[in-house]
Structure formats: C-alpha cells, structure tokens
Amino acid sequence: MYQPDFPTVPFRLGLYPVVDSVAWIERLLEVGVRTIQLRIKDKRNEEVEADVIAAIALGRRYDARLFINDYWRLAIKHRAYGVHLGQEDLETTDLKAIQAAGLRLGVSTHDDMEIDVALAAKPSYIALGHVFPTQTKQMPSAPQGLAQLASHIERLADYPTVAIGGISLERAPAVLATGVGSVAVVSAITQAADWREATAQLLAIVGVGDE
C-alpha cells in the first residue's frame, strides 16, 4: 500500500524528461510537459544555485512538478516541488530535512535490493531502471528489460513508479504496457532530430500525468 513519509505525487507523473539545463526546462514546459527534472552533475552548490533558482521559478510559472536531482539543500532553500536522489545519495542526505520542508522525494533503483532500500525511505515515488541500454550515463548494472520492469511494477502495486533508461519513442508503448505510472526520457528528446515533434509524440503516448 502506498504510504510514503513524504508528500504524495500522482500515480501517473506522465512524461518525465530529465535535462541538464534551464534552457531545456523552459523549452519543454512551454510545449506542455508538466513533470521534469533538472540534473546537473559534479558541480558545487554555488555553481548551480542560479540555475536551480531559475528552474524552480519556471516550474511555478507553469504549475509543473519540478524535481531537482541531488542538490537537496538548494531544493529546500528555494522550495522546489521535489528532489530526486540516487541510491548512493541516500546515506549522505538529510531525508528528514527534505520531509520537514514539504518536498516530494524520488529515489532511483536498479534491482530488488535497491527497491528494498528505497521502500525503507518511503519516498513519494520510485524510479526503476535502467530498462534498456543507455549512453546517457555510465551504469554499473545490466539493463532490466521489460519483463523485470513488469515484475517490479507488480511488486510495488499502487506505489508511483517511473521507468527510466534507454526509453525511445518507439519503446515507450511497451514500457507503459508494464503498468508503470510514468516514463522518464533523456536522449529521446534532447538528441532528437526534431525535439518538438519528439516531445509532442511522447506526450501523445505517455500523457502529462494526473493532477
């Protein structure tokens, strides 16, 4: 049963692009995306604070669910909709501070053991990946594939879930067929020949999520 310690999110967050710049945040919110994550890696807080502030402001302007990857202190300081953390971040993050600030929390997982760890934190949603091979990020684990994804979805029942990793426009329908609540994409949009058309087609398949 879905009983997070953090504020809840809709079961369906819809199409969930993960991007590395404020420019992409603005572009995608302008064309109708309503769940999005700013993921900037390996920079100091002071180097990314201006981008975090700008992204959060855009999220508010478009009434969107804007998640900040990793930089949880900045997310709290500037009142983001939510924070997304990897497994490696859970032990070094003050989860109670995120909870007390009223921010939603998403947690990455790659196997059953990591799902156990995520469930212990009782986040707002659980991300499951990587589903397919991906070039976006170096991954120590093997791709899960659709059958394993479906197994995780069955286990998690009504817990909001997000599939991520190598999901293309062509693969999105099969991913949704597993029962996953949401689909995260990276290169399917940012490396598309026509990002507007790719986003429109993905929105038509996945949707913008529930209110």
UniProtKB/Swiss-Prot annotation:
Q: Which CDD domains match?
A: TMP_TenI
The answer, when asked if Kinase is one of the entry's keywords, is no
Which InterPro entries does the entry mention? Aldolase_TIM, ThiamineP_synth_sf, ThiamineP_synth_TenI, TMP_synthase
| Annotated positions binding 4-amino-2-methyl-5-(diphosphooxymethyl)pyrimidine | 37-41, 69, 108, 137
Residues that bind Mg(2+), according to the entry? 70, 89
**The keyword Transport is assigned to this record:** no
Query: Which residues fall in a coiled-coil region?
Result: none
GO MF annotations in UniProt: magnesium ion binding; thiamine-phosphate diphosphorylase activity
> What keywords appear on the UniProt entry?
Magnesium, Metal-binding, Thiamine biosynthesis, Transferase
The EC number(s) attached to this protein equal 2.5.1.3
Which cysteine pairs are covalently linked by disulfides here? Answer: none
Binding locations of 2-[(2R,5Z)-2-carboxy-4-methylthiazol-5(2H)-ylidene]ethyl phosphate: 134-136, 166, 186-187
Which coenzymes or cofactors are required?
A: Mg(2+)
Q: Could you say which residues form the signal peptide? A: none
Q: This protein's superkingdom? A: Bacteria
Q: What does this protein do?
A: Condenses 4-methyl-5-(beta-hydroxyethyl)thiazole monophosphate (THZ-P) and 2-methyl-4-amino-5-hydroxymethyl pyrimidine pyrophosphate (HMP-PP) to form thiamine monophosphate (TMP).
Per the similarity annotation, which family is this? Answer: Belongs to the thiamine-phosphate synthase family.
Q: Which PANTHER family match?
A: THIAMINE-PHOSPHATE PYROPHOSPHORYLASE, THIAMINE-PHOSPHATE SYNTHASE
Annotated protein name in UniProt: Thiamine-phosphate synthase
Q: What is the lineage of its organism?
A: Bacteria, Pseudomonadati, Pseudomonadota, Gammaproteobacteria, Enterobacterales
